[in-house]
């Protein structure tokens, strides 16, 4: 615990500006964390990831356990040395992937038996093994093994999954041996307000230096997700960081910050970038659109990323049409910087007691994606991951 301290610098309503210290550096919050599923942020060199202002990145326990293995990563000196990333790293527990990518997963009180989405081989995770794997990987922040109940489901099943998550957290705490890693507990409870409150109260009582909020942004409407945050965050300790897991659209980041969330991660900006969809203040720009073929303007004239400072929309469209790898890299770099900068601006607004007006002004210009469109895309991605392997 001595290696990890959270300082709440200032609050503006429920929005918080803080600092979380780790052995590999101090993280200023609110913060967006790029996802490096396979110990790499897809298409980018770690130096580029650092240059766009990334303070911390996330890697995935499930995928690294399968390839190249936690033992190999440990043999290579741990994740930081393996991937040459000098700043903090967070690893998830693998629970979400076990339940979402493994349709044949079998859950019991001790753990989960599942089949690899790569070759169908059988594996088993328990709270103890999930902690052991993450200790070998060596991230600064590790997550408790939890059960993310599928949605929609019954109140009874959601309650059972939540209670199992609580019991598993106690086992994770008992199994943890490394003092240089911070173990976060995870609030569950689906979209049931009473369960969210119960879970938040339970996790808040545990001796963990930070708290994740899981099981959201898995198919429910945004308004429901925001409502669950409003049930959850008021019950969490003010002296610990709150991490909303797997959430990364610009509007969700701002709405999450307004409800007291400090940390976010998502593959959305990198995935969208590789598919030619770029964030701009008005929403998303599809670079494949023919109208950009002769447009000499940058993707976003207000953006300070090297893509926008150097290249035109016409050039990026050309790169995507000719399937040049540089196009994927430039789009990924822009999207990540867009979200990182958004959180920098949010932090500044909080410190100046103007967060609500900042958010209202920003969201008044940004066009969001309809729920039905998002859900169709999410379902297609999950099906692809289950049948073809991860391309996140």
Swiss-Prot record:
GO terms for biological process: queuosine biosynthetic process; tRNA wobble guanine modification; tRNA-guanine transglycosylation. Its cofactor is Zn(2+). Binds 1 zinc ion per subunit. InterPro entries: ArchSynthase1/Queuine_TRR, TGT, TGT-like_sf, tRNA_ribo_trans-like. It is an enzyme of class 2 (transferase). SUPFAM superfamilies: tRNA-guanine transglycosylase (SSF51713). The active site is at 92 (proton acceptor), 265 (nucleophile). Residues 246-252, 270-274 are annotated as: RNA binding. Its EC number is 2.4.2.29. Disulfide bonds: none annotated. Pathway: tRNA modification; tRNA-queuosine biosynthesis. Pfam families: TGT. Substrate binds at residues 92-96, 146, 188, 215. Keywords: Glycosyltransferase, Metal-binding, Queuosine biosynthesis, Transferase, tRNA processing, Zinc. GO terms for molecular function: metal ion binding; tRNA-guanosine(34) queuine transglycosylase activity. It catalyses: 7-aminomethyl-7-carbaguanine + guanosine(34) in tRNA = 7-aminomethyl-7-carbaguanosine(34) in tRNA + guanine. Catalyzes the base-exchange of a guanine (G) residue with the queuine precursor 7-aminomethyl-7-deazaguanine (PreQ1) at position 34 (anticodon wobble position) in tRNAs with GU(N) anticodons (tRNA-Asp, -Asn, -His and -Tyr). Catalysis occurs through a double-displacement mechanism. The nucleophile active site attacks the C1' of nucleotide 34 to detach the guanine base from the RNA, forming a covalent enzyme-RNA intermediate. The proton acceptor active site deprotonates the incoming PreQ1, allowing a nucleophilic attack on the C1' of the ribose to form the product. Homodimer. Within each dimer, one monomer is responsible for RNA recognition and catalysis, while the other monomer binds to the replacement base PreQ1. Belongs to the queuine tRNA-ribosyltransferase family. This is Queuine tRNA-ribosyltransferase. It comes from Herpetosiphon aurantiacus (strain ATCC 23779 / DSM 785 / 114-95).
């Amino acid at each position: 615990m001595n290696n990890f301290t959270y300082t709440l610098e200032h609050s503006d309503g429920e929005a918080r500006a803080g600092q979380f210290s780790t052995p590999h550096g101090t993280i200023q919050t609110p913060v967006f964390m790029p996802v490096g599923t396979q110990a790499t942020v897809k298409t980018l060199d770690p130096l580029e990831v650092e240059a766009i202002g990334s303070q911390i990145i996330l890697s995935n326990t499930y995928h690294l356990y399968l390839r190249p293995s936690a033992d190999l990563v440990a043999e290579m000196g741990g994740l930081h040395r393996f991937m040459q990333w000098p700043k903090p790293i967070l690893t998830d527990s693998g629970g979400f992937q076990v339940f979402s990518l493994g349709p044949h997963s079998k859950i019991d009180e001790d753990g989960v038996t599942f089949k690899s989405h790569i070759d169908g081989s059988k594996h088993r995770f328990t709270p103890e093994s999930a902690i052991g794997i993450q200790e070998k990987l060596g991230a600064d922040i590790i997550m408790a093994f939890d059960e993310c109940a599928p949605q929609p489901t019954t109140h009874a099943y959601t309650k059972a999954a939540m209670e199992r998550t609580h019991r598993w957290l106690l086992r994770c705490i008992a199994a943890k041996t490394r003092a240089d890693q911070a173990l976060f507990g995870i609030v569950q409870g689906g979209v049931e307000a009473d369960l969210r409150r119960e879970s938040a109260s339970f996790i808040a009582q545990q001796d963990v230096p930070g708290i994740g909020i899981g099981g959201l942004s898995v198919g429910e409407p945004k308004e429901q997700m925001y409502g669950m945050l409003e049930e959850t965050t008021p019950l969490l300790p003010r002296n610990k960081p709150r991490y909303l897991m797997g959430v990364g659209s610009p509007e969700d980041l701002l709405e999450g910050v307004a409800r007291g969330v400090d940390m976010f991660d998502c593959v959305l900006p990198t995935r969208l970038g590789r598919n030619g969809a770029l964030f701009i203040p008005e929403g998303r720009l599809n670079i494949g659109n023919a109208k950009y073929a002769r447009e000499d303007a940058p993707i976003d004239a207000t953006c300070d990323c090297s893509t926008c400072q150097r290249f035109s929309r016409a050039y990026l469209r050309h790169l995507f049409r000719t399937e040049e790898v540089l196009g994927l890299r430039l789009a990924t770099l822009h999207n990540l910087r867009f979200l990182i900068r958004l959180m920098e601006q949010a932090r500044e607004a909080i410190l100046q007691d103007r967060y609500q007006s900042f958010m209202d002004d920003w969201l008044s210009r940004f066009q969001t994606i309809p729920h039905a469109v998002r859900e169709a895309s999410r379902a297609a991605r999950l099906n692809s991951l289950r049948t073809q392997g991860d391309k996140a």
